[in-house]
From Swiss-Prot:
The keyword Lipid metabolism applies. The record marks 162, 320, 333 as: Important for catalytic activity. Belongs to the acid ceramidase family. CDD domains: Ntn_AC_NAAA. It comes from Pan troglodytes. It catalyses: an N-acylsphing-4-enine + H2O = sphing-4-enine + a fatty acid; N-dodecanoylsphing-4-enine + H2O = dodecanoate + sphing-4-enine; N-tetradecanoylsphing-4-enine + H2O = tetradecanoate + sphing-4-enine; N-hexadecanoylsphing-4-enine + H2O = sphing-4-enine + hexadecanoate. It is found in: Lysosome; Secreted. InterPro entries: Acid_ceramidase-like (IPR016699), Acid_ceramidase_N (IPR029130), CBAH/NAAA_C (IPR029132). The active site is at residue 143. GO terms for molecular function: fatty acid amide hydrolase activity; N-acylsphingosine amidohydrolase activity. Its EC number is 3.5.1.23, 3.5.1.-. This is Acid ceramidase.
Length: 395
């Protein structure tokens, strides 16, 4: 009994230390300034652009991109398989993924199944592993998204894509394995029809859903994971068992980006469509007041929190916790983000200062793969690979 008490005290002390660390130097810092244009140790580099031709058959749309990125995709798929085999050394789970997963999941909606088949063919990676790579993003996306309105009613959308928590820690360089392997897979995409842009997005090569994007002149959209007991695993299980009346969240965001023609239409679809996993949809428009965070359960919308500059609400911030609840004490990115926005002020919000906010620890952390900045009205869309050199919190 005394031994158990000592273990409990050690665990409690460790948890308290981590909680305190996230809110004290060197794990946090004063709000950064003058970090834009990106440079220095927190800037890994630019993100390449590729065109996805929607006039091509779905099977062929990703051919050019995946020829370039196949080696990097194989690296991350092999890492995921190795992690699975660590827990189930027999290799049976990977065998089921390769042989059974496509049949278990059945037909995917719209063009997505044919697109994944095309990616599998080009990369010589089994279709089941390509499907599991796409499912992966329904479950592990940890992010910070912001929509802010300046004094002139102009909107700016910013997001940090954080990904890879608990998916392998490299003790040699203090980084998350999957986070680092995603950086060379990060791409900017220009989806075109009839040689004209339909929408633009930042994504990971091999993933056919969308996590961050915008429709020039109309709206911007980012997706954050929402942790819930009634979560994505249940939705996927229902899908396998034949209940297919809900959409995969990444497929929904892509469908909205591709087909919606206004902020209100996008908001309506994101609010009402049944989805497989709980999520936060962060949506920005092209005029004053058009910005919101949609908190979703799998079957319904729980909350739509909108900009209202006249009432002093000139920004909305979303991490991975419901806005009416306190964030998990080991993972509070919301408080420092809001603090830095308040210090920036509505008079001074811009691409430059939004990047400053997203560059401040712990909003920037070891999980941060990239930062995206969007100006819908001006048609600006910029994505930058990030690093968080030590001392830096793990999430």
């Amino acid at each position: 009994m005394p031994g158990r008490s000592r273990v409990a005290l050690v665990l409690l002390a460790a948890a308290v230390s981590c909680a305190v660390a996230q809110h004290a130097p060197p794990w946090t810092e004063d709000c950064r300034k003058s970090t834009y244009p990106p440079s220095g140790p927190t800037y890994r580099g630019p993100v390449p652009w590729y065109t996805i031709n929607l006039d091509l058959p779905p099977y062929k749309r990703w051919h050019e991109l995946m020829l370039d990125k196949a080696p990097m995709l194989k690296v991350i798929v092999n890492s995921l398989k190795n992690m699975i085999n660590t827990f189930v050394p027999s290799g049976k789970i990977v065998q089921v993924v390769d042989e059974k997963l496509p049949g278990l999941l059945g037909n995917f909606p719209g063009p997505f199944e044919e697109e994944m088949k095309g990616i599998a063919a080009v990369t010589d990676i089994p279709l089941g592993e390509i499907i599991s790579f796409n499912i992966f993003y329904e479950l592990f996306t940890i992010c910070t998204s912001i929509v802010a309105e300046d004094k002139k009613g102009h909107l700016i959308h910013g997001r940090n894509m954080d990904f890879g928590v608990f998916l392998g820690w490299n003790i040699n360089n203090d980084t998350w394995v999957i986070t680092e392997q995603l950086k060379p897979l990060t791409v900017n995409l220009d989806f075109q029809r009839n040689n004209k842009t339909v929408f633009k997005a930042s994504s990971f090569a091999g993933y056919v859903g969308m996590l961050t994007g915008f429709k020039p002149g109309l709206f911007s959209l980012s997706l954050n994971e929402r942790f819930s007991i009634n979560g994505g695993y249940l939705g996927i299980l229902e899908w396998i068992l034949g209940k297919k009346d809900a959409m995969w969240i990444g497929f929904l965001t892509r469908t909205v980006l591709e087909n919606s023609t206004s902020y209100e239409e996008a908001k309506n679809l994101l609010t009402k469509t049944k989805i497989l996993a709980p999520a936060y949809f962060i949506l920005g428009g092209n005029q004053s007041g058009e910005g919101c965070v949609i908190t979703r359960d799998r079957k319904e919308s729980l909350d739509v929190y909108e900009l209202d500059a006249k009432q002093g609400r000139w920004y909305v911030v979303q991490t991975n916790y419901d806005r009416w609840k306190h964030p998990f004490f080991l993972d509070d990115r919301r408080t420092p983000a809001k603090m830095c926005l308040n210090r920036t002020s509505q008079e001074n919000i811009s691409f430059e200062t939004m990047y400053d906010v997203l560059s401040t620890k712990p909003v920037l952390n070891k999980l941060t793969v990239y930062t995206t900045l969007i100006d819908v009205t001006k048609g600006q869309f910029e994505t930058y690979l990030r690093d968080c050199p030590d001392p830096c919190i793990g999430w």
